[in-house]
């Protein structure tokens, strides 16, 4: 079965996300966990969350994709911004327990002149620290592939694998089933992967 949906606005609440998906024949959807430009998240309305869960269960929804705000930069040169990113992610994990078995997608960050290796190291550190804080969660974390603009890390499949390998090393065990990848086709095309002419080869390389 094909799982298909699109990014929706949370303006009509959590139940509204499920209802909108049903209206267009979708069986999943994506949404921002908070304002994409950052800031404090709205308190979860538990009744609203229960209504969404009911819609998802009754209609056999696939896991939904929650997107972290763009302001999250786990490999910033500023320690304060790195801590802010970590605490924001921990908070989002707690909030997503109201929508069990979600996928939580985030941009691995920009190294801001420190170099890709430093950026990869810092982001992997944050991932391991987050999982040490959210031991009992049904949410799976996804590293989004990036286009490599500016000082973005995660442009190549090799860089994404480095982040995962280092995160597992620092966590002390495998994160299989808890950490994965969001393959953003727009980003990888912009980053140089020819998915138009050689999609099968690109997917094989990714695997």
Residue locations for each model-derived region?
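N-terminal pre-domain/capping segments
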Residues: 1-68, 72, 76-94
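Active-site acidic/histidine proton-transfer and metal-coordination neighborhood
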Residues: 74-180, 190
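Residues that form generic nucleotide/phosphate-binding pockets
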Residues: 55, 163, 205
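Conserved strand-to-helix beginnings and helix N-cap segments that scaffold or border functional pockets
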Residues: 15-18, 42, 116-120, 153-157, ...
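A short alpha/beta connector and helix-capping loop motif
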Residues: 192-207
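Active-site beta-loop-alpha junctions enriched in small/polar residues
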Residues: 7-11, 34-36, 68-71, 109-111, ...
């Amino acid at each position: 079965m094909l799982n298909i949906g699109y990014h929706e606005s949370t303006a009509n609440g959590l139940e509204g996300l499920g209802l909108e998906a049903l209206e267009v024949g979708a069986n999943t959807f994506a949404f921002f966990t908070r304002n994409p430009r950052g800031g404090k998240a709205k308190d979860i309305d538990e009744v609203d969350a229960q209504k969404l869960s009911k819609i998802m269960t009754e209609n056999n929804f696939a896991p939904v994709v929650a997107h972290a705000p763009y302001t999250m930069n786990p490999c910033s040169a500023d320690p304060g911004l790195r801590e802010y990113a970590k605490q924001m992610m921990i908070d989002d994990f707690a909030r997503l327990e109201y929508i069990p078995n979600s996928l939580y997608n985030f941009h691995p960050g920009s190294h801001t002149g420190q170099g890709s290796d430093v950026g990869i190291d810092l982001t992997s550190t944050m991932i391991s620290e987050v999982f040490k804080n959210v031991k009992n969660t049904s949410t799976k974390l996804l590293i989004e592939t990036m286009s490599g603009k500016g000082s973005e890390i995660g442009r190549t499949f090799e860089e994404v694998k480095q982040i995962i390998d280092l995160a597992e090393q620092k966590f002390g065990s495998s994160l299989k089933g808890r950490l994965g990848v969001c393959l953003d086709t727009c980003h990888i095309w912009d980053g140089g992967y020819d998915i138009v002419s050689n999609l099968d080869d690109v997917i094989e390389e990714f695997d």
